[in-house]
UniProtKB/Swiss-Prot annotation:
Protein name, UniProt field: HTH-type transcriptional regulator MalR
Gene from which the chain derives: malR
Source taxon at top rank: Bacteria
DNA-binding region: 5-24
Protein purpose: Transcriptional repressor of the maltosaccharide utilization operon malEFG.
Organism: Streptomyces coelicolor (strain ATCC BAA-471 / A3(2) / M145)
Coiled-coil annotated spans: none
Length: 344
């Protein structure tokens, strides 16, 4: 027991006497200190005493797309941790091709009496989807928050990154490196984040390179799938149109763009620069390390939980969109345009 107390005390940064008071449920310990000791127990793999186990305030559903794209597990982790800190138990429900649909997962969660639901990149982001499903859910009295996507037809809080600003950051960076032929690889046009990225990309290219909107959309925008293979196909088409830089709507697509360049005998970033979007876990360790636009995942995840808990508590936030600014992270996949090298 003494060894265990010492381990926990060292991990939590407190005395063994304080650990003992927490484990025995004694008063006189600050809430933050108590939480540090409990966190140390969890990190070290010790089981919490029965008296210290939190009683769940209820279940909260989290519906995400497939988890192959690492940004979705990252967001799920932030949301799950934030819910747990507030005493709720997260229930992760994942959509997979050929598996359960969003509507089926929603019905399952409602049947289990969840206190609320957070949707990530769901049908609310698809402009062709029927938004009445969300109004029916509201009529059932189930609070919900929608992440990544927006529809004026749905009365609910939305949490989004600023997709237009993300494209402005990427294009401005590439123009500063001397690139004048910049392509955009992204998903199907029916999705709201895709439409917003196109708007930001077209506007910035117009402003900084003087191209017409028609030329940009016709020659420099390539739709594909949000996968490595989709990025590879889109980038191949854009490089074939003499693009020396490609901005991708996800890091997975960007990895596909790098593969496309290499298969064409080109070097990244010497011959082609590539910019991703998300800053997914481990993306800094690719070859080359990927320049990307970082989605503010921690802030978005925490805001989604805070907003949902306000809905659950009966003091709902405004039914509008909360937009979070992205950040450009420059690494090794972007460099000066080929024709710019060696100039004084």
């Amino acid at each position: 027991m003494t060894t265990r107390l010492a381990d926990i005390a060292a991990q939590a940064g407190v005395s063994e006497a304080t650990v003992s008071r927490v484990l025995n449920g004694k008063p006189g310990v600050a809430a933050t200190t108590r939480q540090s000791v409990l966190a140390a127990l969890d990190v070290l793999g010790y089981e919490r005493p029965v008296r210290l186990r939190q009683r769940s305030e209820g279940l909260v559903g989290l519906i995400t797309p497939e988890l192959e794209n690492p940004i979705f597990p990252a967001l799920a982790q932030v949301i799950g941790q934030a819910l747990t800190r507030q005493g709720y138990t997260p229930v992760l429900a994942t959509q997979t091709p050929g598996g359960s649909t969003e509507d089926e997962l929603t019905e399952m969660l409602v049947d289990r009496g969840v206190a609320g639901i957070i949707y990530v990149s769901g049908l609310h982001a698809d402009t062709t989807a029927d938004m009445q499903r969300y109004e029916r859910l509201r009529a059932q009295g189930v609070p919900f928050v929608l992440v990544d996507g927006f529809s004026s037809q749905v009365q609910a809080p939305f949490i989004s990154p600023d997709d237009r600003a993300a494209m402005s950051l990427a294009v401005t960076h590439l123009v500063s490196l001397g690139h004048t032929r910049i392509g955009l690889a992204l998903g199907p046009k029916r999705f709201v984040p895709v439409q917003r990225k196109i708007e930001g990309f077209v506007r910035t290219v117009q402003d900084q390179l003087g191209l017409s909107a028609e030329t940009v959309e016709k020659e420099l925008v390539q739709h594909s799938l949000y996968t490595l293979e989709g990025g590879q196909a889109a980038a191949s088409a854009l490089i074939g149109r003499d693009c020396t830089a490609v901005v991708c709507a996800s890091d997975m697509m960007a990895l596909g763009a790098i593969r496309a360049a290499r298969q064409l005998g080109l070097d990244v970033p010497k011959d082609v620069s590539v910019v991703g979007f998300d800053d997914s876990p481990l993306i800094a360790f690719t070859d080359p390390p990927l320049t990307t636009v970082r989605k503010p995942v921690p802030a978005m995840g925490q805001a989604a939980v805070r907003t949902l808990l306000e809905e659950i508590g009966g003091t709902p936030a405004p039914h509008s969109e909360f937009v979070f600014m992205p950040e450009l992270v420059v690494r090794g996949s972007t460099a000066s345009a080929p024709g710019e090298r060696g100039r004084p």
